[in-house]
Amino acid sequence: MEKNVRFYVCKTCGNVIGLIHGNPAMLRCCGQEMQLLEANTEDAAVEKHVPVYERVEDEIVVKVGEVEHPMEKDHYIMWIAEVSDNKTTRVRLFPEQSTETRLPYEKGATLYAYCNKHGLWKTTIE
């Protein structure tokens, strides 16, 4: 089930993967086990990292942070993902781009945002 997706990071090169099903002990990169990412646990400004959204009919307009996250070359949101019971939608972002994107409204889905410096952040769509 997609809703149970877990994200892992390589502490050496920064690769991130989403594990939908399987044994996380099998996940290796750069010769070492990948580490589970725990959302909302980094010591960083919550108001700049937690995804926020506004419902517009059958979509949501998502951005990262009540105060929009900076999108600089050395500090930016790499991607936003919406994970529901049966699918994951991921939008890749780039430095100097806005974090704003539109996704389908999926009540109960989880929105994730991944900051290249401060890790994984999430919120639930109501």
Where are these regions (language model features)?
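Short cysteine-rich clusters marking metal-coordination/redox-active sites
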Residues: C10-C13, C29, C115
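Intrinsically disordered, low-complexity linker/tail regions enriched in polar/charged residues
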Residues: M1-V5, T12, L19
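Edge beta-strands of extracellular beta-sandwich domains
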Residues: K117-E126
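Cysteine-rich micro-motifs
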Residues: N23-E33
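Residues immediately within or flanking Cys/His clusters that coordinate Zn2+
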Residues: F7, M26, Y112
